[in-house]
Each structure stands twice: as structure tokens, then as C-alpha cells.
């Protein structure tokens, strides 16, 4: 049999032999069906189809007065594949992936904001109107910028990727600034009515930094003392060495009686 296993292909022949030898009393009900529709015997593995990225754009074509919807196919670079990677499944790509990568590369701290992870169909963005950035019932985040930029590319005539990114980014900055102002005003109103919020994040960070500095200062002082003790073990204590030098000077000045 070699490296190929034909047991599944020969299941009908095996059932007939077992029935003839008396191992099974009656032939299986699927015996005639397998005889009419035998399993495939193709041993050649086909390569997975390669899909290209299709983008929707609204452009004003030459000779037309109104913008038209145009579907562009992104040319895929043809590069040789290794034999071990030839039959791997095709990688699924969406246009949003490139927009999302660009936004979070420019705004990495947006990933540090808390997010609400709710299991859904993954098509929540289709239920919103992305003609504006802020959506009712949805928290403003980086995904809103990505969907807003994609809507501009798909619906605004002759819109470029950089221009759509600038428009969505400016709207995002304006809404973020509005949220910060609302948060600051709410905190001031609460403090005016007697609420206390405790130390701010900056004050907490400074306190932790001071504690770390004091811990390092104590450690450095102990290390300096240990270093002085190691040095004194070889050369003697500084005060003893100074006393020995003074005794030697006195002995040189004062004559010893004979």
C-alpha cells in the first residue's frame, strides 16, 4: 500500500468479503448505493484558489457627468511559494485590515482603553449609519474611525485614502476633546457639591516614583557601606591608618633616649 491508505475506497469490497465469509449475517443497506456512487479515487491535491481584494469606489469617469460606482481589483504580487506552503488555506483579507493597522500604528494608546467584549455576529458595524462618526449606543473607539473612513471611500466621489483618513481623524479628535471637557466639567461640578475623588493618576504615579527612589537610595547606601568594608579589609580602616602615620611622625621628631 505504500504511503497511501485505500481502506476507505475499498469499503464495499471489504463488506462483500465479510458477508461471504459469514462474519456479518446480512449485507449492509448502503452496499448497492456505494456500488452506484463509488467514492472518488483522485489522489491529486488541488491548490487552493487565490482570491483578490475587491474595493468599491465612487469615481467620475471620463465622458460621464455623474459619479459611478466602480469596483477595483487590487493587483496581487506573484511570488514563488515553497512546496511546504503551496497547499495552505488562502489568507482572508479585508480592506478594513489595512485601515485598522494604519490607525492603531498612529494611535497605539487607543488599544489601552477599556473595551466591552460582547459576543455577536461580528456584523455590528452594518447596523450603524457611518455617514457620521458618533453612533447612538456605541462607544467611540478606533473601530469607529475605521468604519467612518471606509464609508467615505465607498460613498464620496473621488475620495482618496489619505483624505478620508484625515477627515475621520479630525472628527475623532473633536469628539475626544468634547468627551474630555464633559468629564472635566462633571468632576468640577461634583467637587463643588462636596464630592472627593482622592489623588489623581498623576499624583499616584509621583508617589510610586518617590517610593521607588527612596528604596533605591537605601539600597545604594548599603552597597556603598559594603564596598567601604571590602576596601578596609585590604587596606585597613582610614582612622587606624591616620593614627599610625601620626605615631611615625612623632617618633621621627622626638629623639629616643639611649
From Swiss-Prot:
InterPro entries: Ribosomal_mS23_fun (IPR016939). The keyword Mitochondrion applies. The keyword Mitochondrion applies. It is found in: Mitochondrion. Pfam families: MRP-S25. One of its GO terms (cellular component) is mitochondrial small ribosomal subunit. One of its GO terms (molecular function) is structural constituent of ribosome. It comes from the Eukaryota. Keywords: Mitochondrion, Ribonucleoprotein, Ribosomal protein. Its main location: mitochondrion. Component of the mitochondrial small ribosomal subunit. Belongs to the mitochondrion-specific ribosomal protein mS23 family. PANTHER family: 37S RIBOSOMAL PROTEIN S25, MITOCHONDRIAL, SMALL RIBOSOMAL SUBUNIT PROTEIN MS23. This is Small ribosomal subunit protein mS23.
Amino acid at each position: 500500500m505504500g504511503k497511501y491508505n485505500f481502506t476507505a475506497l475499498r469499503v464495499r469490497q471489504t463488506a462483500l468479503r465479510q458477508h461471504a465469509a459469514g462474519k456479518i449475517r446480512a449485507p449492509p443497506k448502503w452496499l448497492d448505493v456505494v456500488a452506484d456512487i463509488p467514492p472518488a479515487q483522485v489522489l491529486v491535491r488541488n491548490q487552493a484558489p487565490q482570491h483578490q481584494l475587491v474595493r468599491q469606489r465612487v469615481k467620475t469617469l471620463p465622458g460621464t457627468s455623474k459619479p459611478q460606482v466602480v469596483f477595483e481589483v487590487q493587483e496581487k504580487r506573484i511570488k514563488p511559494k515553497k512546496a511546504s506552503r503551496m497547499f495552505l488555506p488562502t489568507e482572508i483579507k479585508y480592506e478594513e485590515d489595512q485601515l485598522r493597522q494604519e490607525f492603531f500604528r498612529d494611535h497605539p494608546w487607543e488599544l489601552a482603553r477599556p473595551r466591552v467584549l460582547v459576543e455577536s455576529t461580528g456584523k455590528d458595524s452594518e447596523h450603524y449609519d457611518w455617514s457620521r462618526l458618533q453612533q447612538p449606543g456605541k462607544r467611540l473607539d478606533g473601530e469607529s474611525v475605521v468604519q467612518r473612513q471606509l464609508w467615505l471611500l465607498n460613498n464620496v466621489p473621488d475620495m482618496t485614502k489619505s483624505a478620508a483618513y484625515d477627515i475621520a481623524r479630525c472628527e475623532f479628535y473633536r469628539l475626544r476633546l468634547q468627551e474630555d471637557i464633559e468629564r472635566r466639567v462633571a468632576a468640577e461640578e461634583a467637587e463643588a457639591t462636596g464630592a472627593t475623588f482622592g489623588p489623581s493618576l498623576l499624583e499616584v504615579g509621583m508617589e510610586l516614583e518617590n517610593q521607588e527612589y527612596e528604596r533605591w537610595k537605601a539600597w545604594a547606601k548599603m552597597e556603598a557601606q559594603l564596598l567601604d568594608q571590602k576596601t578596609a579589609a585590604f587596606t585597613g580602616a582610614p582612622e587606624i591608618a591616620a593614627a599610625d602615620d601620626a605615631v611615625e611622625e612623632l617618633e621621627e621628631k622626638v629623639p629616643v633616649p639611649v
